[in-house]
Amino acid sequence: MINRRDFGKLVLGATALSFTACNSLASGLSTIPANKKRVVIVGGGFGGAATARYLRKFDSNVEIVLVEQNKEYYTCPFSNAVIAGMEKMDFIKHDLYTLAKKHNIKVVHAKVAKVDGANQNVVLENGEKISYTKAVVSPGIEFKYEKGYTKEHEKHAPHAVKAGEQTPILQKQLENMKDGGTFVMVAPADPFRCPPGPYERISLVAHYIKKNKPNSKIIVLDQKDKFSKQALFSNGWKELYGDLIEWRAAQFGGKVVSVDPVKK
């Protein structure tokens, strides 16, 4: 059975090599050669990279162009292990070099402004156009800000839901927290992507705290009254961490109105 780490390598083709097989320009892609078909994929994360790989597997002749704005991709899977000090950032860092080279895929590092379905063009932010026969749109997800927590709060209270820049910030905050401090996490209301995610994070943070800051405490302020795999997590927390973790349901004081990250 393939594990999550190997799956990431398989799909994304993790490598430390340079980006010589990738391009930041879309020159020569404004038209499609006669008797050719081109699939343009917007987004080079799990969805886009897997689509590119399997399209090539099923069709050796189709031209595949993958447009991804970032030259490095950090996987959300295993980012909690980085936050808990069990892995380094390089462990979750990937690029598209191997995918491009091994499967003959053109990678364009640019931001997409729009997909012009009427004219079958992907329009880049710089105005360049990439013509397509078929288009796949897989840009991933973004964090949804709620009242009382805005983008301005991220510097002081990073959510680190999207792995990358915020991941080491949260890891450093946890590392610098005094022994006897309190780690507070707000779990979102349904629906949201990866329902077990917040509780996986709490589990790994608890592992770190038990080992390094045993006098500290974790409080989970949940915006709902039950959560995914609750019995499994609750039993594991009790067995491994005793009363280290305090989970508060929305109806019993978990509901959050606003956050003051400066005053904490």
Regions found by a protein language model. Give the residues of each.
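Core beta-strand elements of the Rossmann-like FAD/NAD(P) dinucleotide-binding domain
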Residues: 126-134
